[in-house]
Amino acid sequence: MSNRVIIFDTTLRDGEQALAASLTVKEKLQIALSLERLGVDVMEVGFPVSSPGDFESVQTIARTIKNSRVCALARALEKDIDAAAQSLSVAEQFRIHTFISTSTIHVESKLKRSFDQVLDMAVGAVKYARRFTDDVEFSCEDAGRTPIDNLCRMVEAAIKAGAKTINIPDTVGYTVPSEFGGIIQNLFDRVPNIDQAVISVHCHDDLGLSVANSITAVQHGARQIECTVNGIGERAGNCSLEEIAMIIATRKASLGLETGINAKEIHRTSNLVSQLCNMPVQANKAIVGANAFTHSSGIHQDGVLKSQNTYEIMTPESIGLNRNNLNMTSRSGRHVIKHRMEEMGYGEQDYDMDTLYEAFLKLADKKGQVFDYDLEALVYVEAQAEDENHYGLQQLVVHSDSTQGQATATVTLSIDGKAVTEAATGNGPVDAAYKAIARASGCEINISSYQLSAKGQGQDALGQVDITAKYHDQSFHGVGLATDVVEASAAALIHVMNLTWRADKVAENKHKLKQARTELGGV
């Protein structure tokens, strides 16, 4: 048996299900490209039949990614498999992942069928998917609670039908490691054709055991782990990719396993996913948390100073976290910025040097010193900028009365190239700015969440504002970055306004196309 563990990333499918606002196609592509650099073997990027937006994003990613296998999810239904195959057809290499529930509670309560009927559906789905590709994965949903006799029958039948990968999910995060390891061992002991497929696991974290269960599974013969960056996902989340990768790398002598993950890309990928998904990483999160390499105890600090491996089982550098936060000023040239970006793992294709350097100089003039984390924040915001913006912030002036708690804001917006100025009073500067923007634009945006975070250290740190807003029953995520909190807040709102404007344009175009088809059909 091979000692290579296949890393199947499902950040863009299972992970995205946990988000308050769906990612845009552009944001999904950014994450997919980062996952490709990270070295994931397979990336599951959507559920094409679920919506036109998901279909488009899967197709866009499939057309772009070259070094990882792109996968799409489909229920055990022909229409789902058709949509997956169509969206993936532009990929250099792709996989169709089809699934059906196998536990007694799911079969009887959800599917309302007999187990034999469900088995026939599974076999039919695998055979149908094989018409489009040899790389078909089949999942036994809720395998952790499926009677072992039924699970063995299902796995054997799916392999016989042509599935090359069989996934055993602990869908509700119910099992403990000894139990889950026993399930995997039973499959290897009892399924006669088990050697004809790769056994995969997909563990959820409802009891905090997803990583432990996944590691136990590979110790019993599984050779694919399904996971997400930062462990994001439904309910309590999924198995964490970075934890799996570093466990296998750090304990290689004990486990005798390896992955194809480029660990130096972990830190950057984690940051990107956290920012785009608007899901901050908890400080004490293993591997990628802010405190993961921080030592507060005097005894620990003394030990690390004497020998780093006294209290560090891996180095920050091993995950791409550079200890050298070299400060840069407005006198730093382009070559310095380019060098720092290269050291942080960014290629020239990841940013526009002219745009970045212009933003860098503006920031350096404001705060004097610019650090690595500032550059990363600037690159992130640059990447969110769209080619076509209907709204732009030209000027923002705020006056606050601390005794009354009131503030007045005057804003000048660029709306389709024309300047519009309005003023408003509110309960604090941000509220006043938002009311003035609404008055100038005529947009009524319902903000459901507002989050402020510091990007860096000290009083001159950049402030990043993330907002989630409701518009026509859809959620949109806006981000703003500035040394001034009110300015960052205004930028985040205008980002959302541009997103909603584009959504309206897309809906308008779809309506026109539908009308045109109707008229043609009537001729």
UniProtKB/Swiss-Prot annotation:
Keywords: Amino-acid biosynthesis, Branched-chain amino acid biosynthesis, Cytoplasm, Leucine biosynthesis, Manganese, Metal-binding, Transferase
Keyword Iron: no
Pathway membership, UniProt: Amino-acid biosynthesis; L-leucine biosynthesis; L-leucine from 3-methyl-2-oxobutanoate: step 1/4
GO CC, one annotated term: cytosol
Domain Pyruvate carboxyltransferase: start-end pairs: 5-267
Region listing for Regulatory domain, in residue ranges: 392-523
Cysteine pairings via disulfide bonds: none
Subunit structure: Homodimer.
Protein name: 2-isopropylmalate synthase
